[in-house]
């Protein structure tokens, strides 16, 4: 086992005693020790909005107790494949329901949503192969649409596709190249999204040796392309050595394996980090490290991951994930809070059993996925609540003690997971591909029911249900202010911080509102030890984010979902250092997020940022996406009824305006068309809607008219009124959501489901208000 450094001293022990005393008798204490803990209000809201069964009119048909029963009973039906006794099934029902109802473990969202329902699609994500032929490519596009229609996400490697301009032997033409075909998959996602289901997420990966790698790296630079894709470059340790040596490396044509030129490794790496700084893409994955841990190399090479990057998969494999709530894996002794290793062990066993049953009960969207998933029986036991656990133990997140604890916990979880899978193998048999797997090699024979059973996945929505911190991330914020319709403020505080603040006598409404505004305790009048224990994501340097990811990676079979947070004024060099540290510390990939880099800065700030963080005055009109949504507003003018259509980008920002008068033709219509074109150009160039309204409002002509008590002075004034009403309506809706933009620097990027504010955590967009997560 990893040895935890003995850095504790009397002061730290006193902190632990204070925290324990503050938590005793609170709802936190009750939740940890209850067989049926009370759910937080936000947990109930998220469950009702996204998980509980409803009829066609949207009426809720079950409560959360019913949901846990539904899932447990459905998954327990798999017991009949191995033991058809009613007693065995009932024991499984009781075990599964108990571990979920105690909020000690939750499977991924599709299992909670769909188990026991008609869809019965229990996996979130899949990887599809993309072969180098037109028929195969568009067959995968069709499969992608089927998966997205069922609510799943998809990962692809486009590394097998011949480069742009290469000769196509069958036709004598030239190849379009990977980036062009990625656009076809992106368009298919848009079409399914328009069909009414939630947007499917995609991961696109290209190996660094592909001749089109530079075009791939810059493919999302303008912010208007591949908006349904995360992209990552697959690199190797050999490539990183050439980066260090400032050396060239070979490009290989995947069609025939021929030499296709050279690039300078350092220049390519610098371009990757610059684009990641600017847009958040591309990430990187260390493909050789991933394949070093491939449990089934006899079945092929791992080429891609799921959309969030933490689950490498063979072609046609699926995600089957769940997370243990570490915040519950504790007990209160006489003086302090301690880890309850026995409870952790039992929870791991129940988790492995439940996830193995998911494989048997899953209704996979494509037969090839069903076959491969049952052949490898891959599962992914992960964690959530690590930051809450650190608070209970009085440990600072960015400390060597926290890093050592992470390794210690993950090593125990990995070993317990292997043991539980081995015990299932004795009863049910090994997974079908076991004979030639890495688990049955000379000197390393271990019966396993499941392949690579440990993964740290995003816990976006299920962590809200469990009422705990996300995955291995630090606390994101300690206090939120929720604005109610009558303009009153409701403070929502982190329960651990609130308990300590009240116990120590420094709690006040004013403190919580100030904390919600600042987002950090850094300059606030609270005890120093409180500032140390209650660290938030933006208090922690990127270096410590990477070191924590690396600590968990050491005992994780697959990969680790983690966001490396940067302040908005971080430089390209800062991102480069993080990418390099991820390589040096053994990570299998890295996702970075610089505040504001994904908030549509071309649209919101009126300019782009330089490497030093200084805003440029140069404006460029964003390219129009293929699909936009909008609303049409009626304004009565002296020239007739005017219909103003305002279309928005996917973040809810006004993007273009079309105007039409009831009586077509003539100079009035021409003037309106000219105004609409110029307003659209201004919006696409980053000029704010408020600024446009200010310029157009009040312009008068000789035909004013009244519209619902408001004087409309002219055609341009009518456009200003419509645009103002749209913007005011959007803001009014946001008033019911979490006011986090001032804390997290996302530029107010709205949730696509409730218009609340999205945060970037675990490599995914996540809404604290309704529970939306791009990765669920």
Model-derived features with residue positions:
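Catalytic or ion-coupling anion/metal-binding cores of large enzyme and transporter domains
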Residues: 4-36, 54, 246, 250-266, ...
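Extended active-site and interfacial segments that coordinate phosphate-rich ligands
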Residues: 138-147, 162, 173-186, 219-233, ...
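Acidic/polar, glycine-rich intrinsically disordered N-terminal extensions of enzymes
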Residues: 1-122, 128, 269-278, 580, ...
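Conserved phosphate/anionic-ligand binding catalytic regions in large, soluble enzymes, centered on
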Residues: 112-122, 127, 133-157, 205-207, ...
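Core structural elements
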Residues: 42-47, 99-113, 208, 352-358, ...
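Internal maturation/activation junctions in enzymes
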Residues: 141, 347-370, 374, 378, ...
């Amino acid at each position: 086992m990893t040895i935890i450094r003995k850095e504790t001293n009397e002061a730290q022990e006193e902190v632990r005693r204070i925290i324990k005393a503050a938590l005793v008798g609170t709802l936190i204490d009750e939740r940890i020790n209850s067989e049926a803990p009370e759910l937080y209000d936000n947990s109930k809201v998220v469950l009702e909005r996204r998980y509980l069964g409803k009829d066609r009119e949207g009426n809720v048909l079950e409560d959360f107790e019913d949901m846990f029963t539904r899932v447990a009973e459905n998954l327990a039906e798999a017991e009949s494949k191995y033991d058809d006794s009613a007693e065995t099934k009932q024991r499984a029902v009781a075990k599964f329901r108990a571990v979920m109802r105690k909020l000690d473990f939750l499977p991924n969202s599709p299992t909670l949503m769909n188990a026991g329902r008609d869809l019965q699609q229990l996996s979130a994500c899949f990887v599809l192969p993309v072969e180098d032929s037109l028929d195969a490519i568009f067959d995968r596009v069709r499969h992608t649409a089927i998966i997205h229609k069922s609510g799943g996400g998809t990962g692809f490697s486009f590394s097998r596709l011949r480069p742009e301009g290469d000769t196509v032997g069958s036709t004598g033409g030239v190849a379009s190249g990977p980036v062009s075909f990625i656009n076809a998959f992106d368009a298919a996602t848009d079409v399914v999204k328009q069909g009414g289901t939630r947007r499917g997420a995609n991961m696109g990966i290209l190996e660094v040796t592909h001749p089109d790698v530079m075009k791939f790296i810059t493919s999302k630079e303008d912010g208007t392309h591949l908006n349904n894709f995360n992209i990552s470059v697959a690199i190797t340790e050999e490539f990183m050595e050439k980066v260090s040596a400032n050396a060239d490396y070979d490009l290989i044509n995947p069609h025939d394996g021929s030499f296709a030129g050279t690039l300078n490794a350092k220049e390519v790496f610098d371009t990757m980090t610059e684009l990641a700084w600017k847009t958040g893409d591309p990430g990187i994955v260390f493909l050789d490290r991933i394949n070093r841990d491939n449990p089934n190399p006899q079945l092929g090479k791992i080429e891609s991951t799921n959309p969030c990057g933490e689950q490498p998969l063979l072609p046609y494999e699926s995600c089957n994930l769940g997370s243990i709530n570490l915040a519950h894996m504790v007990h209160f002794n006489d003086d302090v809070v301690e880890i309850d290793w026995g409870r952790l062990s039992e929870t791991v066993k129940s988790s492995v059993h439940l996830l193995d049953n998911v494989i048997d009960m899953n209704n996979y969207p494509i037969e090839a996925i069903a076959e491969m998933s049952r052949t490898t029986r891959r599962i992914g036991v992960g964690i959530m609540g690590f930051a809450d656990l650190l608070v209970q133990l009085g440990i600072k997140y960015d400390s060597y003690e926290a890093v050592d604890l992470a390794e210690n916990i993950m090593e125990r979880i990995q070993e317990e997971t292997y043991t539980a899978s081995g015990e299932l193998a004795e009863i049910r048999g090994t997974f079908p591909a076991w004979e030639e797997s890495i688990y049955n090699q000379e000197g390393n024979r271990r019966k396993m029911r499941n392949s690579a059973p440990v993964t740290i996945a995003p816990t976006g929505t299920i962590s809200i249900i469990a009422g705990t911190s996300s995955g291995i991330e630090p606390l994101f914020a300690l206090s939120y202010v929720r604005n109610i319709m009558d303009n009153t403020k409701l403070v929502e505080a982190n329960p651990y911080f609130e308990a300590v603040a009240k116990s120590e006598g420094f709690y006040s409404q004013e403190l919580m509102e100030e904390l919600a505004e600042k987002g950090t305790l850094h300059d606030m009048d609270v005890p120093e030890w409180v500032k140390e224990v209650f660290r938030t994501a933006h208090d922690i340097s990127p270096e410590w984010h990477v070191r924590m990811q690396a600590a968990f990676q050491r005992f994780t079979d697959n990969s680790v979902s983690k966001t490396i947070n940067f302040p908005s004024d971080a430089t390209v060099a800062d991102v480069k250092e993080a990418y390099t540290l991820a390589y040096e510390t053994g990570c299998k990939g890295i996702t970075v997020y610089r505040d504001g880099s994904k908030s549509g800065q071309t649209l919101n700030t009126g300019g782009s940022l330089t490497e030093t963080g200084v805003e440029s005055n140069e404006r460029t009109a964003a390219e129009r996406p293929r699909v936009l949504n909008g609303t049409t507003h009626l304004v009565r003018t002296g020239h007739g009824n005017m219909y103003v259509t305002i279309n928005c980008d996917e973040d809810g920002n006004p993007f273009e305006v079309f105007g039409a008068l009831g009586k077509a033709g003539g100079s009035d219509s021409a003037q309106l068309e000219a105004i609409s074109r110029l307003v659209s150009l201004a919006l696409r160039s980053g000029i704010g809607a408020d600024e446009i309204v200010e310029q157009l409002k009040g312009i008068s002509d000789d035909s004013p008219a009244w519209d619902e008590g408001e004087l409309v002075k002219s055609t341009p004034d009518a456009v200003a009124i419509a645009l103002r009403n749209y913007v005011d309506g959007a803001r009014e809706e946001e008033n019911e959501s979490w006011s986090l933009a001032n804390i997290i620097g996302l530029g107010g990027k709205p949730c696509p489901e409730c218009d609340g504010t999205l945060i970037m955590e675990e490599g995914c967009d996540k809404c604290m208000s309704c529970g939306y997560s791009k990765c669920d």
